[in-house]
Swiss-Prot record:
Names of the cofactor(s): Mg(2+)
InterPro entries: Aspartic_peptidase_AS (IPR001969), B_retro_matrix (IPR003322), B_retro_matrix_sf (IPR038124), DNA/RNA_pol_sf (IPR043502), dUTPase-like (IPR029054), dUTPase-like_sf (IPR036157), dUTPase_trimeric (IPR033704), G_patch_dom (IPR000467)
Site (Cleavage): 100-101, 162-163, 217-218, 300-301, 526-527, 760-761, 874-875, 912-913, 1497-1498
Single GO MF descriptor: aspartic-type endopeptidase activity
Keywords for the protein's UniProt record, in alphabetical order: Aspartyl protease, Coiled coil, DNA integration, DNA recombination, DNA-binding, DNA-directed DNA polymerase, Endonuclease, Hydrolase, Lipoprotein, Magnesium, Metal-binding, Multifunctional enzyme, Myristate, Nuclease, Nucleotidyltransferase, Protease, Repeat, RNA-binding, RNA-directed DNA polymerase, Transferase, Viral genome integration, Viral matrix protein, Viral nucleoprotein, Virion, Virus entry into host cell, Zinc, Zinc-finger
Protein name: Gag-Pro-Pol polyprotein
Residues that coordinate or bind Mg(2+) 2: D1371, E1400, D1421, D1485
Zinc finger (CCHC-type): 548-565
Length: 1772
């Protein structure tokens, strides 16, 4: 801390002086406050140690983020002002011109005077070089360093740092010739930092022309000290010139092999260059060059020497085997990534090693597996470096870095530039660090835990090493490492860190735990930590006290041996008396060597240290002592008093104990056992000195009859407290026991549980019931407070009917029992009058007199039972009870519902109703499934091969051991099978299709995937994955039997083993929904408690996001608890705590959301099914990719053609190129999180074919696309934009919950007004939108592609007829004949089409082709074409529909090529109206008619009529005048009619004598019509005329609707006969018939023969429908009403009777006099013969006669009827 503060002050001092030189005066205190704010917002800044422009701009970015996050009130007013002042100071482009001139002059002097090595050395004070002035000017950079292309004869130029202090040669400094002043290795490594982001633009690491390095200067006043520095430089220049002259003279005098070298080569001829600053010409490898003596450690593969002429030569030498051996030994003994091994590797890497040398070295040192791992990592690092080199443009590619391709030879690799060697070094060492730790199989980071005696620093080192392997660098996971450094530390270190956990960083942790060693030091370390000191300082401070306390008298200033009082008191030596131990001699007890007492009883061993050996000592425990096993029981008589006048006996702990506040009250052993002396009881009180030290001793009462061990109840109040062994901490006060006559409740106490006498809680009981009124989900309930009830119970009568409840698997017991009671399906929010609230899930029981509030609710309300008695209250306080904190030892209370614990020993005593309800713990399970039928389903098990059967047996055994299945005797059975996965493992599957068919399917709870873009920007996230989610959710017990299966045996050697699933089975239709509901219920409490969190749950993936990281972790902790309670488990390896996250197929990295890398397997795309799957996946990713519909059109076109899924498909060149584009888009495109504080913009771009939408907030958020296939064949582009607006608004509300603030589309305001007036979609799209509709796009490069498509409005096709235009009429026929007429000319031609619409479209194309340059007024009788052709001008994409799309495309091209407008209008055909337009249309229509070459015969006409209408044989015979047998053969040969045989008529019904006299009415069902399956049928019994309508039901209102329709066709009947259905017998229907004066009669109940006529009509109608439904006539296909009307047309107008009359003829042209025979009949009542009357029906043995006298029909036996001739005789 002191170092950081001194550096802090030094910054401020220098900045104040620097600002003062610019005329800016600031206060020292203000700058200190400013840097305090810098430290808070940028914790990394003080550790950097330097201010330069790049770091300072990072500080500015942090300021801006802090401002955006917390607002202006959290930022000091002067923060940005001071930041700008300092930026101007350190930005060289903005420095005072005078200062710049002085610096430039200094650099010029340095350039001309740095030919020699300066003997002075820069100051080693790191605090001086705090502020650097970087130059962004390339020229300045180039001039600040020596030229790379200097002549080789010149010496290297050195630029020492400009210092403020006087520099002088230090006698202890190393020889300047041994110091490499270039010192660019570190800078080069930083320039090629492999941890840089891969796509950031940065300056090239090495410029071949002018290398540059930053000029580092201290902030000084150049004007004041420049002269002094220049004078020093001039002196050094003179010395250098003399030095160079001396060297030249000595070189001329050299003889033999003696050589005098420059200081650069003073250490030897061969050196390994360390980043030379000058360009060194490379020579060829000189193998024959004479080698001088070299030390082994300096022998490395590539070395460079400089000869006397200054020429540089490179050599390639072999490795010194001592280096390889040392590295091999270190890797074998300590591991490849041990610190010692890495140090050797780094020392080797400091030299020039070619890629081949690295590969040779690694292969020699490491094992085969590690070598391959290193090689793969090395190649990956080189690949990333090559990508950065490509951006930098320095030409160093992947082959050069790996030594492959053209650079595989050693000669080629020797010629590499120094910078390239540095990159190879960085890639190789980084790959080495990725090697696995020795003995570590690859454990996860959370598995690294500190051992009991492991030093904390070693533990942190292991954490950082593991994090480096996982994250690539330890810095990337520093927050995670810090968290685990506390969580996985041992208890001693955790206790030391805990008070400072949020106040320091990882280095602070290490400092706090530096003195914590083995267990015996832990107590001392904890005490020191909580006093804010190290152990050393803690001990030193204790030793600073002058003099100690005397152990004899307790006074300071002398020791016990010099105590005068002790000497005075013991002047007379006291002789020992009778030994209290053995009672057999006069000697001191501690000198007693007897093993038995005077009675012969064995004596316990001595306590304390003895000469025979070390004392046994108590067992030591950190968290509380236990009585040593060797320590014997001590009676009360062994206790001592502190002084003769002490009232109490001293109690002490038998072991060293450390107590923390988190532990709560602990029982400390004393080794003292009861009973107490007769007629006494004990009172335990704490010593006052102990209380001052923070140890609270709870008072306690010791009963006289208690014989167990007396313990001290103690608790650490605020800090960690160490209780040494033997220290007095409490006193036992013996008090007299007064016996009373009170009744004894229990027998002798003996060795019962430790504590005082049982306490009875006293509460006054009154006649008033303790009732309480609460609100559950805002509904008021009143109930009794029942402290004995485990759960809350609501009576069924008070429970709202619409609140869902479910059956449970528990029993409620009390005074009586309730089995499987119902419980609320969801948690309810309770609220009291004071607005306190919580969550409960009450039970619901019928016939309960009153609601009961149980402890699950009372504990949340923190209700306490208090007594007015001070004695009882004091007793409870003595037992450790603190009001408001609960009775737990941690005093933390119970804030959540009490877990229900079963009590099986309680029995009922009668009728159910209890005041204390005990509940068996419910087993949580999935909701019960609703079944269509309870009929068992049994599907036989398939036979399995021996291999598959063995695999199935093994898998079943594993599931049985896991508890997922159980043995079964269920009557249900479905087959199982096994499949082998690619990994070679088997997978067990069950065919549940038969079971799925019997269940009611649950709807999808999440119809779509959640989008990560809706997570608020800047939120911290935690993502978890539930482990085996389906197998963690129990099935409802009532459903388990339905998922049974059998395990067969070969050759039926044994009975099949039967099992059934206990958990959600896979492939069960409702498993996903049940899983989602179960998990959603489990995390409901978390959602309610953390409403500020953004929680996403999809299947087994859960994401938590929030602003505050600490709150996110707390929410995560509660989530883990709730999931654990629900039986769900989190996969530890799938907990994601930091970027990059992987979620639902996306990668979340900071604000960016990208798709995971994907490679499309083009060789697998062969069938329509393959392409359909591929396009489905691409379409799912399109909201996150910049791919338009036009881009994907080549792939969409592959889906056209044969509909067979296995039909062959192939990739076109365009589609192949598109797949590459898709891969690139997936790899490069990204979207961002939404910022809800900014306006949300929805941009619409004019892309080809269809428009494209984009949600935008300074960056893309989500792309929106219309379907690839338009909803209409011809969809205008402006209508497509309207559809996109609707889709965008829908997406905005669905994903973000808001409407877009601004919608930007391509049309101007005047164009939008036109669209609002002339289109249907635009008013709908903009309805109720209150945002801004604009056409000005934001300025951004990404938005430029919106200009790709030019939009158009109708210009060529006029909406009104043109003047002076050519009048043309077109027509087409289904025979393929097309024609158009103009004036007196008619042109017709034959086409190969058979659709009248398409033939007429051909005629229209011919007109546009024939008159391209003339205005036209075209009229057609096709309303379809008259509407479609005007749309072609604005349609961008035409839906593919066989020939239609081709003809429309051809017509559209003709329209685009026209420059003269035309008009197209519609005229009704065959209207018969006068005038030229009707005449012209008729003329064109006649031109399409063709004269048949031969006249069809009657037989052919009958066959065609039957094919179209399926007429019966009678009708065909009469209608086409063909023989009866030919008509029957036509019907028999029809494949449809052959299955419908005629049904004989077995009876007769009364019929009306006139039309509309008697109707019969009924309802029949035809399920294929869906919602319109109810067919209401009425038939006129006189004529057989049939009427029918389709209704959605059969109630009275539907019957009345049907009759009104019938009345509108044939009028009102006199009588209607129906059955006894509720729709006919209702009061409303009776009133309806009475109002219209219609007589309504019903038949015999449940006797359908009374409705025989209408029942036969049902059969005829359904038969006709079945026939025509299978035909090919266009109007009847797919439309129920058309099919029904066609059937009625056939039955009423086409079917003829033997009189050649249809039902319509009989109804409209009735002649009853010619139809009925006249008879006379005998009335059996009066024996009269009234005659003549007509016969309605002549049946078998009976006749129905219509009595004209009585105006009613009479049924008579045939013997009472006599037929008379039918003439005009009158009645007698």
């Amino acid at each position: 801390m002191g170092q950081e503060l001194s550096q802090h002050e030094r910054y401020v001092e220098q900045l104040k002086q620097a600002l003062k030189t610019r005329g800016v005066k600031v206060k020292y205190a203000d700058l200190l406050k400013f840097f305090d704010f810098v430290k808070d917002t940028c914790p990394w800044f003080p550790q950097e140690g330097t201010i330069d422009i790049k770091r300072w701009r990072r500080v500015g970015d942090c300021f801006q983020d802090y401002y955006n996050t917390f607002g202006p009130e959290k930022v000091p007013v002067t923060a940005f002002s001071y930041w700008n002042l300092i930026k101007e100071l350190i930005d060289k482009k903005e420095v005072n011109p005078q200062v710049m001139a002085a610096v430039a002059q200094t650099e010029e002097i340095l350039k001309t005077s740095s030919h020699t090595e300066l003997t002075t050395k820069p100051s080693q004070n790191p605090d001086l070089d705090l502020i650097s002035l970087d130059s962004d000017d390339e020229g300045a950079k180039g001039s600040s360093l020596k030229d790379k292309n200097l002549s080789c004869t010149k010496k290297p130029k050195r630029f020492p740092v400009l210092l403020t202090a006087q520099t002088s040669a230090d006698p202890e400094d190393p020889n300047p010739s041994e110091v490499d002043w270039d010192g660019l290795e570190d800078e080069a490594a930083k320039y090629h930092n492999p941890d840089w982001p891969p796509f950031l633009t940065r300056p090239p690491p090495y410029n071949k022309a002018t290398p540059s390095a930053p000029t580092v200067m201290a902030v000084v006043n150049p004007k004041e000290e420049l002269k002094e520095k220049i004078a020093q430089l001039e002196e050094q220049i003179k010395l250098e010139e003399l030095h160079q002259a001396l060297i030249s003279k000595l070189q001329k005098l050299k003889t033999g092999n003696e050589t005098v070298t420059s200081p650069e080569t003073a250490g030897g001829f061969s050196r390994t260059p360390h980043w030379p600053g000058q360009h060194i010409p490379k020579g060829k490898c000189c193998a024959s060059r004479e080698k001088e003596e070299q030390t082994p450690k300096d022998i490395f593969p590539v070395t460079e020497t400089v000869d006397g002429q200054g020429q540089a030569w490179r050599h390639h030498n072999g490795f010194d085997f001592t280096v390889i051996k040392e590295l091999k030994t270190a890797a074998s003994q300590y591991g490849a990534t041990a610190p010692y091994t890495l140090a050797i590797v780094e020392s080797v890497a400091d030299n020039w090693l070619t890629p081949t040398d690295w590969n040779t070295l690694v292969r020699a040192v490491l094992s085969g597996g590690d070598h391959l791992l290193w090689k793969s990592e090395f190649f990956e690092n080189c690949r990333e470096t090559a990508k950065r080199n490509q951006q930098a443009g320095n030409g160093w590619d992947f082959d050069m870095l790996t030594g492959s391709g053209n650079y595989s030879s050693t000669d080629a690799q020797m010629q590499y530039d120094p910078g390239l060697f540095a990159q190879i070094q960085a890639a190789a060492t980084k790959a080495w660090r990725k090697l696995p730790v020795k003995g570590d199989p690859g454990a996860s980071l959370t598995g690294v835990k500190q051992g009991p005696d492991e030093p904390f620093a070693d533990f942190v080192h292991r954490l950082i090493t593991t994090a480096g392997r996982i994250f690539g660098s330890a810095e990337a996971g520093v927050d995670y490492v810090k968290q685990l450094a506390y969580e996985n530390a041992n208890p001693a270190c955790q206790a030391a860190i805990r008070p400072y956990r949020k106040k320091t960083d990882l280095t602070g942790y290490i400092r706090l735990c530096s003195d914590i060693g083995p267990s015996y030091q832990q107590g001392l370390a904890m005490a020191a930590a909580f006093s804010g000191q190290t152990v050393k300082d803690f001990l030193n401070n204790k030793n600073k006290e002058k003099g100690g306390c005397c152990f004899k008298c307790g006074r300071k200033g002398h020791f016990a041996k010099n105590c005068h009082e002790h000497i005075h008191n013991n002047s007379e030596t006291k002789a020992p008396g009778l030994c209290p131990r053995c009672k057999r001699g006069k000697h001191w007890a501690n000198e007693c060597k007897s093993k038995t007492d005077s009675q012969g009883n064995p004596l316990p061993p001595h306590q304390g240290n003895r000469t025979e050996g070390p004392a046994p000592g108590p067992e030591t425990s950190l968290w509380g002592g236990q009585l040593c096993s060797s320590q014997q029981k001590q009676p009360i008589s062994k206790l001592t008093r502190a002084t003769p006048g002490s009232a109490g006996l001293d109690l002490s702990s038998t072991s060293h104990t450390v107590l923390t506040p988190e532990m709560g009250p602990q029982a400390l052993s004393t080794g003292i056992y009861g009973p107490l002396p007769p007629n006494t009881f004990g009172l335990i009180l704490g010593r006052s000195s102990i209380t001052i030290k923070g140890l609270q001793v709870y008072p306690g009462v010791i009963d006289n009859d208690y014989t167990g061990e007396i313990k001290i109840m103690a608790k650490a109040v605020n800090n960690i407290v160490t209780v040494p062994q033997g220290n007095r901490i409490a006193q036992l006060i013996l008090l007299p026991l007064i016996e009373t006559d009170n009744k004894v409740q229990q027998p002798y106490r003996g060795q019962g549980s430790f504590g005082s006498s049982d306490i009875y809680w006293v509460q006054p009981i009154t006649c008033q019931k303790p009732s309480l009124t609460l609100w559950l989900d805002d509904k008021m309930f009143t109930g009794l407070i029942d402290t004995g009830a485990d759960v809350t119970i609501i009576k069924l009568e008070d429970w709202p009917p619409n609140w869902p409840i479910t059956d449970t698997l528990t029993n409620l017991r009390g005074i009586g029992q309730s089995n499987n009671p119902k419980q609320s399906s969801k948690y309810l929010t309770w609220r009291d009058k004071e607005n306190n609230s919580g969550l409960i899930k009450p039970f619901v029981i019928p016939n309960l007199p009153v609601n009961l509030w149980g402890r699950d609710l009372l504990s949340q309300m923190k209700i306490m039972m208090c007594s007015p008695s001070d004695i009882v209250t004091a007793q409870m306080l003595a037992q450790g009870y603190s009001p408001g904190k609960g009775l737990g030892k941690n005093e933390n209370g119970i804030l959540h519902p009490i877990p229900n614990q079963g009590q099986f020993d309680k029995k009922g005593f009668g009728n159910f109703l209890t005041a204390a309800i005990d509940m068996l713990a419910p087993q949580q399970c999935a909701e019960p499934i609703t079944w269509k039928s309870d009929e068992p389903v049994w599907v036989d098990q398939w036979p399995l091969t021996s291999e598959k059967l063995a695999a199935a047996q093994q898998l079943v055994q594993e599931q049985l051991e896991a508890g997922h299945i159980t043995e079964s005797n269920s009557p249900w059975n479905t087959p199982i099978f096994v499949i082998k996965k690619k990994s070679g493992k088997w997978r067990l599957l069950q065919d549940l299709r038969a079971v799925n068919a019997t269940m009611v399917l649950m709807g999808a709870l999440q119809p779509g995937l959640p989008s990560p873009v809706a997570i608020p920007q800047g939120y911290l996230k935690i993502i978890i994955d539930l482990k085996d989610c389906f197998f963690s959710i129990p099935l409802h017990p009532s459903d388990q039997k339905r998922f049974a299966f059998s395990l067969p045996s070969t050759n039926f050697k044994e009975p099949m083993q039967r099992f059934q699933w206990k958990v959600l089975p896979q492939r069960m239709a409702n498993s996903p929904t049940l899983c989602q509901k179960y998990v959603a219920t489990a995390i409901h409490k978390v959602r309610h408690a953390w409403k500020q969190m953004y929680i996403i749950h999809y299947m087994d993936d859960i994401l938590i996001a929030g602003k505050d990281g600490q709150q996110v972790l707390q929410c995560f902790d509660q989530l883990k608890q709730e999931l654990t309670i629900a039986g769900l488990h989190i996969a530890p390896e799938k907990i994601q705590l930091q970027d990059p996250y992987t979620y639902l197929g996306f990668e979340l990295n900071g604000p960016k959301i990208t798709n995971q890398k994907a490679v499309i397997r083009k060789d697998k795309l062969q069938t329509l099914n393959d392409f359909q799957k591929l396009l489905g996946d691409i379409n799912w990713l399109r909201p996150y990719l910049k791919l338009t519909t036009a881009d994907l059109k080549p792939l969409f076109d592959t889906l056209k053609g044969d509909s067979n899924p296995n039909s062959h498909r192939s990739l076109s060149k365009e589609a192949l190129a598109l797949l590459d584009k898709v891969e690139t888009a997936i790899a490069e495109q990204f979207v961002t999180h939404i910022n809800y504080s900014l306006p949300l913009m929805f941009l619409i771009f004019n892309t080809a074919l269809t428009p494209t939408g984009l949600f935008w907030q300074n960056n893309p958020i989500m792309w929106v696309h219309l379907p690839a296939s338009p909803k209409k064949v011809l969809l205008p582009y402006y209508d497509a934009i309207a559809d996109l607006i609707i889709l965008g608004r829908d997406h905005s509300k669905k994903y973000f919950g808001i409407e877009p603030s601004v919608i930007i589309q391509p049309y101007s305001k005047s164009q939008i007004d036109w669209l609002m007036q002339n289109t249907e979609m635009w008013p709908i799209a903009c309805a109720s939108y209150v945002g801004i509709l604009d056409n000005h796009y934001p300025p951004n490069k990404l938005i430029q592609f919106c200009k790709l498509h030019a939009f158009i409005f109708p210009q060529i096709i006029s909406k009104t007829p043109l003047n002076n235009a050519l009048l043309v009429f077109t027509d087409g026929s289904s025979t393929g004949m097309a024609a158009y007429t103009l004036a007196d000319t008619t042109i017709k031609f034959q086409t190969n089409l058979n659709s009248a619409q398409l033939v007429e479209l051909q005629a229209l194309i011919a007109v546009l082709s024939a008159f391209p340059n003339q205005p036209l007024n075209i009229y057609t009788d096709s309303a379809y074409l008259a509407h479609s052709i005007p749309l072609l001008e604005t349609v961008a994409q035409i839906k593919h529909i066989s020939e239609t799309a081709k003809l429309f495309l051809q017509c559209q091209q003709l329209i685009y090529n026209r420059s003269i407008p035309f008009y197209i209008g519609h005229v009704r055909a065959h209207s018969g109206l006068p005038g030229p337009i009707a005449h012209g249309n008729q003329k064109a229509d006649l031109a399409t008619k063709t004269v048949a070459s031969n006249i069809n015969t009657n037989l052919e006409s009958a066959q065609n009529a039957h094919t179209l209408h399926h007429l019966n044989a009678q009708t065909l015979k009469l209608m086409f005048n063909i023989p009866r047998e030919q008509a029957r053969q036509i019907v028999r040969q029809c494949p449809i009619c052959a299955t419908y045989l005629p049904v004989p008529h077995l009876g007769v019904n009364p019929r009306g004598l006139l039309p509309n006299m008697i109707w019969q009415m009924d309802v029949t069902h035809y399920s294929e019509f869906g919602n319109l399956k109810y067919i209401h049928v009425s038939i006129d019994t006189f004529s057989g005329f049939l009427l029918a309508t389709l209704q959605t039901g059969e109630t009275t209102k539907h019957v009345i609707t049907h009759l009104l329709h019938c009345f509108s066709i044939i009028g009102l009947p006199k009588q209607i006969k129906t059955d006894n259905g509720p729709g006919y017998t209702s009061k409303n229907f009776q009133e309806f018939c009475s109002t219209l004066q219609i007589k309504h009669v019903t038949g015999i109940p449940y006797n359908p023969q009374g409705q025989g006529i209408v029942e036969r009509a049902h059969l005829s109608l359904k038969t006709t429908i079945e026939k025509i439904k299978k035909g090919e006539w266009y109007p009847t296909k797919g439309t129920p009403r058309n099919i029904l009307n066609h059937a009625l047309f056939i039955l009423n107008f086409l079917n003829l009777d033997d009189q050649n009359h249809s039902a319509a003829d009989r109804f409209w042209h009735s002649n009853p006099r010619k139809q009925f025979a006249m008879v006379k009949w005998k009335d059996p009542l009066d024996n009269t013969w009234p005659w003549p009357d007509p016969v309605i029906i002549w049946g078998r043995g009976s006749v129905c006669v219509y009595s004209q006298t009585h105006d009613a029909a009479r049924w008579l036996p045939e013997r009472l009827v006599k037929q008379i001739p039918n003439n005009n005789q009158s009645r007698e």
